[in-house]
A protein has these predicted regions:
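Short, surface-exposed recognition loops or helix-turn segments adjacent to catalytic cores
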Residues: 14-22
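C-terminal interaction appendages of subunits in large macromolecular complexes
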Residues: 2-6, 10-11, 15, 29, ...
């Protein structure tokens, strides 16, 4: 139903012959809605890759209405998979912007987390795989993962004993596909050329196109009613004046003579007609069957003509106020289908998660003071502290110098080490 309302209309479609010339096919479909923004799209080309994120149906309708009224509007992505999104750097979908999308993670109890919504572009399998990889690398500690997904997403994450659920949630966002960053790039074909536009610009072009298509539809409908009105007026005069019973008509020697007689009889009424009477009109009058003539009712004919004139006046009013007509059309669309498209993705501002604070201490740091090496593989040497593979190490030497260096399997730092430990960034309490 939506496609019939919005996408398909043979009367406003530009057609061309198919490859074999036997059928017609559309050059483009006359779409009266920003489907590109509603569905999103992704494509690749050398230097012209495109990634347009999907948006909410109701918000697109509201934005189109606001634009037509000359009011401001803002559009932000909305995903069927739900989750939450940080649009601080969305940049109206233009190249160079970025959004962060997170899964929805709930605490069922102190030992179990439930992922019920996943980020856009991910599947339950890819999310689970990313969690298991993070476990293998020692980034997070969990006991097992269960996939109970059916009609709705449900991934259960069972925590290891003694593991903080809050810290694990942050770690899932930091090290797995529970949080992803997406870089939109609104590259579209406009006027047969690629252009990098904003989402707002695309919506404005769509709204203008919708207005033009609705105007075309009104003009086509008006033309059809005018044709019906023209023939109804001809038919009424032809039957009421009993032109079909004229002696000259009945005794016409050929079709041309009959047409000439009808044309002559209609001549006094020409000023009342909408357009010039053609031979095709006269031939159509001659095709009226006797049964229709016998059942003809003048009052009903007058009612029909009056009704068609009212419809034409109404269409003329719509054409004179085409912006208001387009606004009402978008409002009709929203009222008819909007309840089926609630917003699924929550708009939020995400706090930055520092990986070093949520990663599990999955390694042990050692030092060989005599040879000047530190690392996680020097298990026979002096133990320093537990650490993770993304931590930094701070080292002070006896001459007063110090260095900060990443944790490594084995690294030469120098002899005469006075102090060594895991370096905590933004630690304002420790004095060296």
């Amino acid at each position: 139903k939506f496609a019939l309302d919005v996408v398909f209309n043979p009367k406003t479609t530009e057609w061309k012959l198919s490859y074999d010339g036997r059928n017609k096919e559309p050059v483009t479909l006359p779409v009266k809605f920003p489907l590109l923004l509603a569905q999103g799209v992704e494509g690749i080309a050398v230097g012209l890759s495109s990634k347009i994120l999907p948006h909410n149906f109701n918000e697109l309708c509201d934005a189109s209405i606001n634009y037509l009224r000359g009011e401001e509007f803002q559009l932000y992505p909305d995903f069927q998979t739900g989750g939450s999104i940080d649009v601080a750097k969305y940049n109206d979908g233009e190249r160079g912007g970025a959004v962060k999308v997170r899964a929805k993670i709930n605490k069922l109890d102190n030992k179990t987390l439930a992922i019920t919504e996943i980020p856009y572009g991910k599947t339950t399998s890819s999310v689970i795989d990313s969690i298991l990889k993070a476990v293998d690398k020692g980034k997070i500690k969990i006991r097992k993962v269960d996939d109970n997904t059916a009609a709705n997403v449900e991934i259960l994450v069972h925590l290891a004993p003694g593991t903080s659920s809050d810290k694990t949630i942050d770690a899932l966002y930091a090290f797995t596909d529970c949080e992803v960053s997406i870089s939109p790039n609104c590259c579209v074909i406009d006027d047969s050329k690629p252009h990098f536009l904003t989402v707002s610009k695309v919506l404005k072009k769509s709204a203008d196109n919708t207005l033009d298509l609705l105007k075309q539809e009104l003009e086509i409908k008006k033309g059809e009613i005018l044709e019906s009105l023209h023939f109804a007026s001809l038919e009424k005069i032809f039957i009421e004046e009993r032109i079909y019973k004229d002696k000259e008509f009945e005794q016409s020697k050929d079709m041309d003579a009959a047409c000439a007689h009808i044309d002559e009889r209609l001549t006094p009424y020409y000023p009342t007609f909408i357009r010039e009477v053609t031979k095709e009109d006269i031939l159509k009058l001659m095709e009226i069957k006797m049964g229709r003539i016998l059942k003809f009712n003048s009052d009903k004919a007058d009612e029909l003509i009056a009704k068609m004139k009212e419809e034409i006046a109404e269409i003329d009013n719509h054409l004179a106020h085409i912006v208001d007509y387009t606004v009402n059309w978008y409002q009709m669309l929203k009222n008819k289908y909007g309840k089926n498209f609630p917003r699924h993705t929550e708009l939020r501002n995400f706090d930055t998660i520092e990986a070093a604070k949520v990663v599990e201490a999955n390694e042990k740091l050692y030092i060989n003071r005599e040879e000047g090496f530190i690392g996680t593989t020097l298990k026979k040497d002096e133990f320093v502290a537990c650490c993770s593979d993304i931590d930094d190490v701070i080292i002070f030497f006896r001459d007063g110098k110090y260095i900060v260096t990443p944790v490594a399997d084995k690294k030469f730092v120098g002899k005469n080490v006075l102090y060594v430990n895991v370096f905590k960034k933004n630690d304002k309490r420790t004095i060296y």
